[in-house]
Amino acid sequence: MRLIGLDGEQLGIVKIADAFRLSEQSDVDLVEIAPNADPPVCRLMDYGKFKYQEQKRQAEARSKQKVIQVKEVKFRPATDEGDYQVKLRNLRRFLEEGDKAKVTLRFRGREMAHQELGMRVLERVRDDLIELAQVEAMPKLEGRQMVMVLAPRKKAVGKPDAAG
């Protein structure tokens, strides 16, 4: 088998018995790295320490990942302009933070007869956020509410910014 030492140096091709003896003398483990290679490749290492460092690396990678959440903002067909602007600002903030936004438009009572008003509100939201978001799920009616899902647009990579 081909043997790799503690510091990653090549120890060459050795017999299995010699490799086991070396690992016992050094008080480390003999770990098979590439069983399908010809000859198989083994390495002398402290396996417990290796597993610990591997777990630390995986935990660090997990902590760097951003969990995308779906934030919901509720509208009504007759939402006033001031309220509309506040809700739109919240949607902007959610999208800029990288979260998806679920825009829900709730119909009450006889408002169900005028679904086109609700559709207009959702289209207005879409048009106001066109530079920040793309529509992931087109508006659709679910019971007494119309739902649309917006996802943040991918930022263009390598685009020179205005500052310089």
UniProtKB/Swiss-Prot annotation:
Main subcellular location of this protein, as a coarse class: cytoplasm
Subcellular locations according to the entry: Cytoplasm
Disulfide bridges in this chain: none
Cellular component per GO, a single term: cytosol
Keywords attached to this entry: Cytoplasm, Initiation factor, Protein biosynthesis
Record flagged with keyword Protein biosynthesis: yes
Molecular function per GO: ribosome binding; translation initiation factor activity
GO terms classed as biological process: ribosome disassembly
Functional description taken from the UniProt entry: IF-3 binds to the 30S ribosomal subunit and shifts the equilibrium between 70S ribosomes and their 50S and 30S subunits in favor of the free subunits, thus enhancing the availability of 30S subunits on which protein synthesis initiation begins.
Family under the similarity heading: Belongs to the IF-3 family.
Quaternary data: Monomer.
Designated name of the protein: Translation initiation factor IF-3
Species this protein is from: Bordetella pertussis (strain Tohama I / ATCC BAA-589 / NCTC 13251)
